[in-house]
Amino acid sequence: MLWFKNLMVYRLSREISLRAEEMEKQLASMAFTPCGSQDMAKMGWVPPMGSHSDALTHVANGQIVICARKEEKILPSPVIKQALEAKIAKLEAEQARKLKKTEKDSLKDEVLHSLLPRAFSRFSQTMMWIDTVNGLIMVDCASAKKAEDTLALLRKSLGSLPVVPLSMENPIELTLTEWVRSGSAAQGFQLLDEAELKSLLEDGGVIRAKKQDLTSEEITNHIEAGKVVTKLALDWQQRIQFVMCDDGSLKRLKFCDELRDQNEDIDREDFALRFDADFILMTGELAALIQNLIEGLGGEAQR
C-alpha cells in the first residue's frame, strides 16, 4: 500500500452516487494510454494495485482509492531554441530576407512536431481517496494544481463532480497563530518544532523556523510584530505527524512505526490482502485525524 504523503482535502458540495461498481466502468473510458508521437502529455486511470490487479478502483468500508497516471514529454527550452534558430537561419539564407514574427511562430510549431517523437517521457502517479461515508475526497499531492488536474480527470470520467476545497469557519492561519502564541494546540494535537510565519503586510517578509522551540520569545516577538502562522508542524495522538497549511492541506504525513507495522503479521507475498488491510488502516486513521482537525480548527465553514 502506498501510504499517502500529502493530503489536499475537498468536500462534496452535494450528494452524488459514488459506487465502485459504476465508477469502474466510468473510469475505464478514461483509462491511461501512452502518448502518441505528437502528444505533449496524456493522463488517465491505472489500477491502484499496479500489476497485482486490473481493477481501476479498490473499495473497503465505504472508502474508494483510485490512481491517475500522467505522461509528459520533456523538451528542454534550449533544445527547442537551438533547433528553431538553425531552421530560421537556414530559411533566411535561402530566401535572402528576414522572416516575419508570424513565420517564426509557425516554424516553432514545426520544430516542436519534429522533436516530439524523439523526446523523453516523464511519468507520475497520483492517488485519490474518496470517503463516501463523510463526503470527502483526498488527493495525495502537494500542489493544488496537480490536485485540480486529477479532479478534472475524475469529473470528465463521471460527467459531474461537485467539490470545493475543505474550508473552516475561522481563518486557519489565525487559529494556528493562537496555538503557537499560547503554546498549546487543540486537544489531541501537539506542537512540534517547525513553523512558517508571514507578515500580513505586502512585502513584509517570511520567517521559516526549523528545530526551534515555537514557544520561545523570538517566535512570540514575530507574532507580536504582526506575523501569522501559515504552516505548523503537528503531532496527532503520537500516531501521525504532519505540517498543517493555511490552505487546509496537510503536507509531509509521517505515520508512526507502530501504525505502519500493525499489519506485519500478514504475509507480504499476499499483496492484495496486505494492500487492503493497509488501506483500511490508513483511511481509518486519516478520517479520524481530519475530523479532529475540523473540530480543533473551529469547525467547517457553513455552505
Swiss-Prot record:
Q: Give the similarity note.
A: Belongs to the RdgC family.
**Listed GO molecular functions?**
double-stranded DNA binding
* Protein's recorded name: Recombination-associated protein RdgC
Family annotation (HAMAP family)? RdgC (MF_00194)
Q: Which GO CC annotations does the UniProt entry carry?
A: bacterial nucleoid; cytoplasm
Q: What does this protein do?
A: May be involved in recombination.
Q: Tell me the keywords, alphabetical order.
A: Cytoplasm, DNA recombination
Q: What is its main location?
A: cytoplasm
Intracellular or extracellular location(s)? Cytoplasm, Nucleoid
Give the classification, highest ranks: Bacteria, Pseudomonadati, Pseudomonadota, Gammaproteobacteria, Enterobacterales
UniProt cross-references to InterPro entries, sorted A to Z: RdgC
Protein's UniProt keywords contain Mitochondrion = no
Listed under GO biological process in this entry are: DNA recombination; regulation of DNA recombination
Protein's UniProt keywords contain Cytoplasm: yes
Pfam families (UniProt xref): RdgC
